[in-house]
Curated annotation (Swiss-Prot):
A Pfam family recorded for this sequence: Abhydrolase_1
Enzyme class: hydrolase
Cystine pairings recorded for this chain: none
Family recorded in the similarity comment: Belongs to the AB hydrolase superfamily. Carboxylesterase BioH family.
Swiss-Prot/TrEMBL keywords: Biotin biosynthesis, Cytoplasm, Hydrolase, Serine esterase
Gene for this chain: bioH
Catalyzed chemical reaction(s): 6-carboxyhexanoyl-[ACP] methyl ester + H2O = 6-carboxyhexanoyl-[ACP] + methanol + H(+)
GO cellular component: cytoplasm
Source species: Escherichia coli O6:H1 (strain CFT073 / ATCC 700928 / UPEC)
Binding-site list for substrate: 22, 82-83, 143-147, 235
Listed name of the protein: Pimeloyl-[acyl-carrier protein] methyl ester esterase
């Protein structure tokens, strides 16, 4: 049974697990890990098949969540960015006793556009899947460029993401494909109505992958949750607005 790459930093009395997004790895958190590890016991994770967590093929969302849980602390705040938000949400649904609070960042319970639901057009996701087999490095780079588009610091934010990707070997194509399949098919809108723990949802106003129109829709669907929109951020608010981002998490810690 393979273990995933897992790094623990800091001595805080509350555990915080950070789960990265599609195509990336835990190096994406280096812009905030020093600050967060001064407040939390921080856990940095490479999701199965990504970064240093080699030896995994494409997994379903449920299987990915179970693999991550095997090495996790008994109880933690779980924070997931983008695809990682679905993994953290799945853990909150299946093992609520392990989750002090759930935080999703630039994430949607249903990334794919549906009837009366804004999201990524299914043919765009299918196009990414098709292009992966042709030129997967270029496809990943295009996806990263989408994530920072529109922000004042778009160029340097995109460079930071690209550096994260290139710092480690690229994931296998089937792992990348499996991640896109999760983004294309999973819909947790209804299940997440009933999660019992504090639930904080963070968004970028300029996000091209998770449209801000979903925010009031989810405020209504999940009245027990809280939402916050970074006015000048896109898909990676922790890179463009690290201080504001960390401040929100430290404030959440006081409430759990």
């Amino acid at each position: 049974m393979n273990n995933i790459w897992w790094q623990t930093k800091g001595q805080g009395n509350v555990h915080l697990v950070l789960l990265h997004g599609w195509g990336l790895n835990a190096e994406v958190w280096r812009c905030i890990d020093e600050e967060l590890s001064s407040h939390f016991t921080l856990h940095l994770v490479d999701l199965p098949g990504f970064g240093r967590s080699r030896g995994f093929g494409a997994l379903s969302l449920a299987d990915m969540a179970e693999v991550v849980l095997r090495q996790a602390p008994d109880k933690a705040i779980w924070l997931g960015w983008s695809l990682g938000g679905l993994v953290a949400s799945q853990i909150a649904l299946t093992h609520p006793e392990r989750v002090l609070a759930l935080v999703t960042v630039a994430s949607s319970p249903c990334f794919s556009a549906r009837d009366e639901w804004p999201g990524i057009k299914p043919d765009v996701l299918a196009g990414f899947q098709q292009q992966l087999s042709d030129d997967f490095q270029r496809t990943v780079e295009r996806f990263l460029a989408l994530q920072t588009m529109g922000t004042e610091t778009a160029r340097q934010d995109a460079r930071a993401l690209k550096k994260t990707v290139l710092a480690l070997p690229m994931p296998e194509v089937d792992v990348l494909n499996g991640g896109l399949e999760i983004l294309k098919t999973v819909d947790l809108r209804q299940p997440l109505q009933n999660v019992p723990m504090p639930f904080l949802r963070l968004y970028g106003y300029l996000d091209g992958l998770v449209p801000r129109k979903v925010v009031p829709m989810l405020d209504k669907l999940w009245p027990h949750s809280e939402s916050y929109i970074f006015a000048k951020a896109a898909h990676a608010p922790f890179i463009s607005h690290p201080d504001e981002f960390c401040h929100l998490l430290v404030a959440l810690k006081q409430r759990v």
